[in-house]
């Protein structure tokens, strides 16, 4: 369901009506909402869905490094997750393009922090961005130390909401990602993590 059109055209009402009809009539259907205006939270709560508030101060957390064995639709999950971590690091560092050395270091550290999780058939507790930063700090290259310093705000600092273990139900059949309070600093990162969380869910 795509909610688009001119203001006042009844988009939200129509979307809510359709969502309600789907949830009540199709037990196999799942609905995932990205809600920038907090329009759908009351309906989702009323239908016993999961509302996930995404912000720097929220008690809801999505681990940016969550990954299941089906991530990426059958390809090597760690390789595909490494591509996501590269994109995420570009945003964490300030939206600048990463150099070849930086990319190699990030790819190496990503493979390293997922090694035991992968060997355990993607069961148990996945790593977090804090684990990823600790792995960066173990590397000898000065570029690794620079990356670790650049992402510290988002792993151990005040914007570390995506560096913690997931504490919400991302498998509910009705999910609303409430991004109204996502500040300017976290917005591009938050959208990346939300979309990756959805990918992790649907593949």
Specify the residue positions occupied by each region the protein language model found.
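P-loop NTPase motor domains
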Residues: 1, 38-50, 54-58, 63-203
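Glycine-rich phosphate-binding loop of nucleotide-binding enzymes
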Residues: 1-55
